[in-house]
Amino acid sequence: MTTGYESVPTSEPSDNLAPRAELWQRHLLEKKEGDQSISVSAFNISSMHNELSGLSEKSRQRVEAVWAAFSEASCSERKLALQGILNNCSSSLLSFASSTLDSLVRLDFLSLLPVEISFRILSFLDARSLCQAAQVSKHWKELADDDVIWHRMCEQHINRKCEKCGWGLPLLERNTLYAAKASIQKRYERLTKRGVDQAHESSPVKKAKLDDYPTSSNEETISSVKPPSPNSDSKFFLPFKTRPWKEVYAERCRVECNWRHGRCRQVVLSGHSDGVMCLQLVRNILASGSYDATIRLWNLATFQQVALLEGHSSGVTCLQFDQCKLISGSMDKTIRIWNYRTSECISILHGHTDSVLCLTFDSTLLVSGSADCTVKLWHFSGGKRITLRGHTGPVNSVRIIRDRGLVLSGSDDSTIKIWSLETNTCLHTFSAHIGPVQSLALADSRLFSCSLDGTIKQWDIEKKKCVHTLFGHIEGVWEIAADHLRLISGAHDGVVKVWEACECVHTLKNHSEPVTSVALGDCEVVSGSEDGKIYLWLFNNAPNESPVSTQSVPISSLNGQRSNSSVQRALSSVPNYSSSLSNISTRNLNIPPSNANNDDVSIQS
């Protein structure tokens, strides 16, 4: 018996047809490990064999003769024969031929190609197309859902704007990426050695590598996924022992959709008795400083206050905290360093002759700005203190760009100065604002500034010029915060604005007093006001409708008392948190030594 386009012996069972050189590619059976499925063509051959055996001897011989003659004909003869057959077909037969051809001409190319080539093809699809591809078949689903594909998708979108689609997804969890990436590379190499070399030894196509795909230039923090176990195995790929990258992508995509459509819920934190001057947000821990001379720490998972730091004799104007210490500046002219887990003040730094208005620090350096018009550099090691002079008005904001060796400062004199950490000299002065510069924000290589002239400006530090001016607030802008995806601003008009690509996309209104401080997270906007209230706009797990009702969370006075155990539990999510609280000392808090007050080097710009 002959079937299809080439000769096939009738004595050979149709469900055990071996691949033959004279068969077309679509006739080859898909033999996969642990998979008993067969191709559509193989099923048709088996069906025809069964129908043929049910015919009379004369009819069977007539059909076999037609098949044999067609198989022995040349290509041009076959075309001519088909044209003649089709011309003699009724409408019902033509309809049957059309439906039959529709399934025969389809080719599952991903099943025929080497797996790494399939990955390469799928890597050009967007997220929606990948989800649609996963619905084609089980084999396509395994390929389209694999970590290799979705890890690349996460690298392309998370914490950055995709150049192709313009979407960027929030970072959310901040754990290292390199271990997960190395695990995926190992899986990929194991796959190519195990599957491709055995099933496609004759394939001349060069194997693609994971390193060929575009990857992130910043491989610090992308996913909360732990690497899969190297000892686990599965039918096709190593199984997921933790959250798959597709799930990670989907979670962040939901949050980004909430950002885009303005879907959020609102929470109000009440605890300060006077205006909120400064905020800092690290994951689910929020620190706030106020005119009431206190610093409060909040757990945003429960919206509860977990620590109260008291010691300043006047309003707290600025603060920053890391894994184990919090540094604050005050209108009492001092800088205090706290072990915020025990609410203990570790050190007090004196040096400024007027209110300390701003500060920032990294692993080796503390920079502060004051109403005395100076910028001070406090070195954690060696005790050296340097004073930078050049501003003619109070210094309201300072920032460190460590990889460039620069310090930035913004002042009431309407200027922004760039200082060299190597020479301690002023390299350049920006002077485009016509009002006091209140806040500076850095995102990637972009510098933003806001002023009481009601504008926000974006600067090119390399070219030393203003590249964008953002208008939207009707009164002075007090503070801004930025990340890789967006910028937020709080102003004297009592509103908070969310900006993307230099355009205002949302305006958040609920404050009854001027907004004096803001903080930006991956899925939240935080703002503080002169009325002492802190507003949170939460874009994760947002309801379908917007706006939503406000949830107020009043906090009773702690009177400076809070058990260490509750603080430790609340702060356990802070990155690199050590459970050994008893070992915290002045030395490992990494603070300027007490003799820093005696080694003041004054630099005039």
Swiss-Prot record:
- Phosphoserine modification sites? S229, S232
Q: Please give the positions of the paired cysteines in each disulfide bond.
A: none
The uppermost taxa in this organism's lineage are:
Eukaryota, Fungi, Dikarya, Ascomycota, Taphrinomycotina
GO molecular function annotation = ubiquitin-like ligase-substrate adaptor activity
Q: Which domain of life is it from?
A: Eukaryota
Question: Which Pfam family, just one, is annotated for this protein?
Answer: F-box-like
Tell me a GO biological process for this protein.
intracellular protein transport
Question: What is the name of this protein?
Answer: F-box/WD repeat-containing protein pof1
Q: Where is the composition biased (Basic and acidic residues)?
A: 195-212
The record's section on Gene3D superfamilies has: 1.20.1280.50, YVTN repeat-like/Quinoprotein amine dehydrogenase
Q: Which organism is it from?
A: Schizosaccharomyces pombe (strain 972 / ATCC 24843)
